[in-house]
A protein has these predicted regions:
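Active-site-adjacent structural elements in enzyme catalytic cores
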Residues: 1-186
Length: 186
């Protein structure tokens, strides 16, 4: 059974910290950021599973870090670079897919919507996660947006990367996993 309580305030699962060793270690970033934790307890480590794709050599310790359970059904790619270069690349790729008849989506933010206006095929679903100056708005929309793309039958999603500062680290952690670690620098 799945219980849906509607929109949530934060949109991210909790931060998980392992305190069983001398130096506490963040196992999963969340709305309580690395910086907040460091300000309170001092030295804090970071599980290397957060920083890169799990391999046979190491596996994540935290629940929710082992699987792509929030991944959309679509092929999702994240593009990293300047806003203009990322938008140009996404516009080109999204239009190519849409012109071939594939349901296509774009994930952006309020500040970048103007980069896409009148340049994308009218059938492309463009979603802003929120305001870059208010990362909690982005965190709040993550999973709803991915599910909305699923409901629409989207086959390809092209998204922007975000700053990994403060809560942005948790946002990019979730998006990176959802994209199967498919991040392209432009």
């Amino acid at each position: 059974m799945i219980i849906d309580g509607g929109m949530v305030g934060m949109g991210l699962e909790s931060t998980i910290i392992d305190v069983t060793s001398k130096t506490p270690m963040i196992l999963r970033p969340g709305f309580i950021t690395y910086e907040m934790i460091k300000d309170v307890i001092g030295e804090v480590g970071v599980d290397k599973a957060i920083l890169s794709k799990p391999t046979a050599d190491f596996k994540p310790k935290a629940p929710g870090m082992k699987y792509r359970h929030y991944a959309p059904e679509a092929d999702y790619s994240i593009y990293r670079g300047t806003a203009e270069k990322v938008a140009d690349k996404i516009i080109m790729l999204a239009n190519e897919k849409a012109d071939k008849g594939f349901k296509t989506g774009v994930i952006t933010v309020d500040q970048h919507l103007n980069l896409y206006q009148r340049k994308l095929n009218k059938d492309i679903m463009v979603v802003s996660l929120g305001n870059l100056d208010k990362p909690e708005t982005i965190a709040n929309m993550l999973f709803k947006t991915l599910r909305d793309f699923d409901k629409a039958g989207t086959k390809f999603i092209f998204g922007e990367a975000f700053s990994q500062h403060n809560v942005g680290w948790a946002i990019m952690n979730r998006l990176t996993k959802a994209a199967g670690y498919n991040i392209i620098d432009v």
